Amino acid sequence: MLAFLAFGGRHTWFFGDDWAFVLDRQELLDQGRIVDFLLGPHNEHLSSLPILLYTAIFRIFGVDSYAPYLVCALLAHGGVLWGVRTLLHRLDAPAGWRLVAIVWLGFGAGGAENLLWAFQVGFIGAIAAGIWAVILVLTGAPSLRRDIGAAVLCGVGFLTASTVVPLVAATAVVLLRARAYRRLATVVLAPGLPFLLWYLLVGRARAPQVAHPESVMPQFFTTGLTFTADRIVGVSSIGVLVVAGAFVLLRSRPSSEPGRRDLVDVFFLVPLITFALAAYSRSYLGLEGARASRYVYAAAATIIPALTLAAHQLYESRRPARPLVGLLAVVALGASATSYVDFRAGWREYSGDTRPALELTPRLASAPLADPEYSSKHPAHPNATRQRLERLIETDRWNPTTIWSDDVQARVSLRAGVTQRETLDAAIARSYPTGATLRTGTAEPLDTGGCWRVVAGWPDESARIDLGTRGVIELTWPTASVVLRIVDRDGTELASGTVDLSRGSWIGFETLVGSVELVAPGPRIEVCNIAPTTRAG
């Protein structure tokens, strides 16, 4: 299963928060700010162990390949799968049903985001640590050795991500109900109090300060639960009914094993606590945030063993229900696999768009008016600025060697090689003399030095000027927008984009391929800082 997922994720690449660990944390380490490097929160999470993991991989492999990072996330996923298998084995589920659960959760059960994004190694790893802590506490004969092992795992989880909190909290409820106060102190309080102290002194103060809209929280909570249940079951609108039915079925079964009932309670408490915490910390994102696939995975890690156990129990006890149980199992497995395939296709398309932008951006570092803090004009990569990417190359942490097509290079040139300013010092403008070849009409000088009016030959024709490969121009007419096209030697368009002049009438540009052509929305255009030459027929 893990080998298949590794093969499926071969086209993924660094995204979003990956860069926070690769760039931000490495800068803190290089500056000697060890406390900030290790204990500074990522959002509200204490992520010390994932940070150390990313640092080790970065120092060995750099960012030439995403595979070493993704493999670690998949190994954490393997820890979750083996934990689910162990829980079901301890609950006497047959091997066939254990295999169903592994395949079901193996494809993410609607939470495939975690299987394609290496950064989620912390998210998944904390869940794995929590599941194995539950196994030590609630299966087998109680012993101090097992409790200490569980406490260590809880501590590992706290140092990895806050996704361990629901598992620890659910375990605490069970121990408190059993009045096992010594075990509660060992397993929960010993690792939990240092984490709580960190959160109060460091995490809460330095995490992003966001609103917590109380009016949205209840709906966020219910939306998250219903959406998650539907994704896990694979059928819209019945997920909550199926999960609730499984709870009733499992809790109504007479059992002489108190540990079995405790495990069932933990299985169903974890999603409730997960979405209660998410409703408090993420409700500012709106209800769409409740549908994030990563939360589906967090709930599925305990809901799937519960549903598998209920399915096995129903299958064995009620023969007429077997066709329905089999049908629901097939639908759920198919939905999980389909969700993975769909998410993988979208992720691959997304990586195919953003990776060239990040790889080619450093090659446009000397573009006129270039901003060193430029971050590929994509909100998902705010940490990956041009300056930082250049530094990775200079320090041999990155050697981008991908050969991109002319079309791709042209698109990136329009995104990363075009910069606008509202004002510009005349000396700077003169340092970028821009040649101009008329594509249409004629040019006549204006009274303002270095400014020209270009008029097309026909009233219904757009004025067009070939500006070469790099330069700086000022547009005085039109005032709304113009189009920049990148064309090859034959005049074939490679890419084009509209420039909104309300963001600045001064435009600096450079292209990696072809030349830049300025196209007016009408027959007239007035442009400064150019030196028109002969007309190109």
List the predicted regions and their residue ranges.
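Intrinsically disordered, polar/acidic, low-complexity terminal segments
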Residues: 1-44, 54, 59-99, 173-175, ...
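Transmembrane alpha-helix segments characteristic
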Residues: 100-101, 258-284, 329-332
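Aromatic- and kink-enriched transmembrane "portal" helix at the membrane-lumen/periplasm boundary
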Residues: 66, 99-127
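Hydrophobic/aromatic-rich transmembrane helices and adjacent perimembrane loops
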Residues: 115, 123, 287-312
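Short hydrophobic alpha-helices at membrane interfaces in multi-pass membrane enzymes
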Residues: 135-157, 183-186
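Transmembrane alpha-helical segments
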Residues: 77-88, 129-141, 152, 168-176, ...
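Membrane-interface alpha helices of multi-pass inner-membrane proteins
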Residues: 146-162, 167-174
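Perimembrane helix-loop-helix junctions
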Residues: 165-192, 196
